[in-house]
Design a protein with these regions (language model features):
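Hydrophobic alpha-helical transmembrane segments and their immediately adjacent juxtamembrane loops
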Residues: 44, 216-316
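Peripheral, non-transmembrane regulatory/ligand-interaction domains of membrane transport proteins
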Residues: 1-196, 203, 213, 217-220, ...
Length: 316
């Protein structure tokens, strides 16, 4: 689907259907074969470049040749939880400047109006590109904040319940943070390259100052992602060690109980309840209400002595 936008009083306004294909700003989402042919013809795009833009694994980069500027950056998708797996993908967003026209291409269904209709004033297509880079950086920052809060909540749940579900979600969150850090590093390098070549790419001084602010925000966001990723990795390792230590302590207690019960089970197994009843009737002549409590007391004393022996042997 292709949607056109025109400039009006420092803002972008959606163009009519008749003017969509000739608008200075075009947005193409999930292009079909006909739209791909239109893009290749009107913006002189090769099939390889178009496939690179639509590839979600493509690294952020910029190309400037043949009077055409191609920018590929990363943009975060919506965060969701599917079967205890945190889904936070990163998509590729392509921008092409050719003959005073700007084309955005992406292979996902997302609302792009928040990028174009932001409070920032836009006078030409390069202002629009700067605005999109700025909004992408802010979007990453908001996602990092949400993921940090989710990490803290999952840590508390792991401590309280020690459930494998929460731990798997923590692993999934750590994987997403790794993808985010990689995407932010690529975007930061892209913005740095645009800033260092503003005159060559046709940006004016005011736009360069705006790019400088975006560059600082991107570097800060990139550093925040790296710090959060490092903390999450170390905290995840610590949680795993803590859970392993808890399991080891539990197994130690169960082993101690089994060892203490072993002599008692041995005595009860050799004698047996039926044999003890016959032995009591023939030799002790005591009522069962007296003989069995004495037997249980004896077994308890044996267990207590076993416990004390283990203590002296430094096994407890």
């Amino acid at each position: 689907m292709i949607t056109g936008y025109v400039f009006e009083n420092g803002k972008l306004v959606e163009a009519d259907d008749q003017e969509a294909n000739t608008s200075p700003v075009l947005i193409c989402t999930e292009p079909d074969q006909i739209e791909k042919k239109f893009i290749q013809t009107k913006f002189d795009l090769g099939i390889h470049t178009l496939q690179s833009i639509l590839d979600e694994n493509e690294l952020p980069r910029i190309e400037n040749r043949d009077n055409k500027i191609v920018v590929i950056c990363k943009h975060p998708m919506h965060i969701g939880i599917i079967d205890r797996d945190i889904d936070s993908r990163v998509m590729s967003l392509g921008a092409v400047i050719y003959e005073d026209r700007l084309l955005f291409i992406f292979n996902e269904k997302i609302s792009f109006k928040d990028f174009l209709f932001a409070p920032m004033r836009v006078e030409d297509i390069r202002d629009v590109l700067i605005n999109v880079l700025h909004r992408t950086t802010l979007h990453f920052h908001e996602h990092l904040r949400c993921m940090s809060l989710a990490m803290e909540q999952l840590e508390e749940e792991v401590i309280e319940t020690a459930s494998s579900d929460q731990l798997m979600m923590l692993f999934s969150l750590g994987k997403s943070m790794t993808y985010y850090a990689s995407a932010l590093n690529g975007n930061n390098a892209l913005i740095e390259r645009i800033y260092n070549n503003t005159q060559k790419l046709g940006f004016n001084d005011i736009q360069k100052e705006t790019l400088d602010d975006i560059r600082l925000d991107s570097a800060q966001c990139c550093q925040e992602a790296q710090i959060t990723t490092t903390i999450m990795t170390k905290m995840t390792d610590a949680r795993i060690s803590l859970m392993g230590n808890n399991v080891s302590n539990l197994m130690k207690r169960l082993t101690i109980i089994s060892i203490i019960m072993m002599p008692m089970n041995l005595i009860a197994g050799i004698g047996g309840m039926s044999e003890f009843t016959v032995f009591n009737e023939e030799y002790f002549k005591m009522p069962m209400a007296v003989s069995y409590p004495i037997l249980f007391l004896f077994l308890g004393i044996v267990g207590f002595l076993t416990y004390k022996c283990l203590q002296k042997m430094y096994l407890l």
